[in-house]
Amino acid sequence: MTRTPVGAAGAAPDEEPGAEAFGAWLLERLAAYLGRPIGPDTPFAEAGLDSVAALGLYGDIEEKYGPLIDPTDIQLYPTARELARFLALRTPRPLNRRSRVRAAFVFTGQGCQHPHLTSGLYLHSTGYRGHLEEAADALVPFLGGRSVVELILSGDPAVHQTAFTQPVLFAIGYALARMLEESGALPVAVAGHGVGEYAAAVVGGALPLHDAARLVALRGAFMQHLPAGGGMLATGATAERATEAAAGEPDVSVSAYNANRATVLSGGLPGLERVAGRLAADGVACRYLRVAHAFQSPLMEPVVPRFAAVARRVPGGSPRLPFYSTVTGAAADGPLDAAYWTRQITEPVRFADAVRHLVAEHRPTHLVEIGPRPVLLPFLRRLGGAEGPACLPVCRGPRTNAVDLAGVLSALEAGPFAGALAA
């Protein structure tokens, strides 16, 4: 994974409020580990900071300031000055209630589907209804003539079949985001979890609706026809512990890094059962996700050739909005083309990295979960910090209606009464 450090090396320590205090504290801790003082621009490796001491420094940071960073960030910001600036950027600041809302849209992925999803909002919001029908029309040619609107309103259990789940979630994400934009809530950045990246790419300006509809529908159809026997296991383990528990299981791998102690594994069901047993013996909570296959894992490889052939016929563009990739864990710095979407099928979801970078680099006041029900909210709250962005879902389940939507728009200072609220 390639991650780009925030800010240029050698930036002045007072460029970011709080960096100077972080720098002084870091130099004190580094002197304790190294047995001698070092300068703010001395590279840690050159000073002799080994991996054990670096892990100790990470522990000191977490104990004093909370989960601001990952252990690997100490390698990415390899001097006290650079690390201090990054810590200052990561530190949540109290919101100024008079400051303008800066919302980032985060699109939910597979696993949040349920019968009648967003049906209440469809019936009571003309804005949402219009955009959902627009997305449904774009998908119909690739779904054998079936409409995702019919699937939603009928409560059809086919919504749990991958060939329909992915297009339905794409349509919902697209419609919810367009409805918010139409009401005046414009995102400063976007990100998506797994298949949620397709709606994020459309809203971010990298893909037209019809091209994204083609890709996501065929992606789901190809995956639907894979042999049964795969699954996904959500765990309360750290990435390191989950990887350790999966050692010796060749068809089990980490498929999502959602937050600290929130790691998902994908693989064959027998292997997942053995891993779950090992984790349970250590008191680590585990639960199986309601999915039919081992998504975001090498077991998806059989899909790749067919999907790549389709994706090559769709010209992917560069996003116009900052797009935080959960493939790389950082802001996209090139086009979201066939190579990107093909890679996305088998790569793990680096959700935690993407959200941390989004928050550090864009300072949103709100993280808005775009999906039929909130499943990412706990991770967003942990990643944003206690005093960081407010986290809110657009939908809380199938009964979400126009009244609930009005509350969301009010929180985002959008909607028909935005001017009066801001006065």
PLM region spans:
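Phosphopantetheine-dependent thiolation modules in NRPS/PKS and related acyl-activating systems
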Residues: 2-96
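Short beta-strand
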Residues: 37-38, 76, 192, 253-258, ...
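FabD-like malonyl-/acyl-CoA
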Residues: 47, 76-80, 94-247, 285-294, ...
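Acyltransferase
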Residues: 233-234, 284-370, 374-378, 398-421
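Helix N-cap motif at beta-to-alpha junctions
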Residues: 239, 267-272
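Gly/Ser-centered flexible loop/linker motifs
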Residues: 242-260
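Short amphipathic alpha-helices in soluble, non-transmembrane regions
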Residues: 246-248, 272-282
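A generic structural motif
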Residues: 261-267
